[in-house]
């Protein structure tokens, strides 16, 4: 019986979770599902430019496991782009990292996971930053 997968550490929840080719109705498209941790692997390696060892540490997995997650993610994205399928980002086995955040407008501090469209819970400003 295989071991249950470890919970992967994800720093940022995706702000957008669905992509499809322009001009083609959804009824005519098939769909590829990319997990949240697969997207995180692409973000860390391809967008942030980190080495595999550093990415694996950030996600709390071994380097070979990180490599498998990244390879699976790249294969799914390539399939969607080349074959013109929709790409849905959902699910997986992950835990969002909680950070101390501060609003630049009102100074309110709170603990939460980073999300692209997050608002200050006090004044609804989008002008916030992470406190170390």
UniProtKB/Swiss-Prot annotation:
HAMAP family: UPF0251. Belongs to the UPF0251 family. This is UPF0251 protein PTH_0588. It comes from Pelotomaculum thermopropionicum (strain DSM 13744 / JCM 10971 / SI). Pfam families: DUF134. It comes from the Bacteria.
């Amino acid at each position: 019986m295989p071991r249950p997968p470890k919970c992967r550490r994800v720093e940022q929840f995706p702000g957008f979770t669905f992509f499809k080719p322009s001009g083609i109705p959804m009824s005519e498209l098939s769909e590829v599902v990319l997990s949240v941790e697969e997207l995180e692997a692409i973000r860390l390696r391809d967008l942030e430019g980190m080495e595999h060892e550093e990415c694996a540490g950030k996600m709390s997995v071994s380097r070979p496991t990180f490599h498998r997650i990244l390879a699976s993610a790249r294969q799914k994205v390539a399939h969607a782009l080349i074959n013109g399928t929709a790409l849905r980002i959902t699910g997986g086995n992950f835990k969002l990292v909680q950070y101390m955040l501060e609003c630049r407008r009102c100074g309110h501090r709170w603990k939460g996971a980073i999300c692209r469209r997050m608002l200050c819970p006090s004044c609804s400003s989008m002008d916030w930053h992470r406190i170390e």
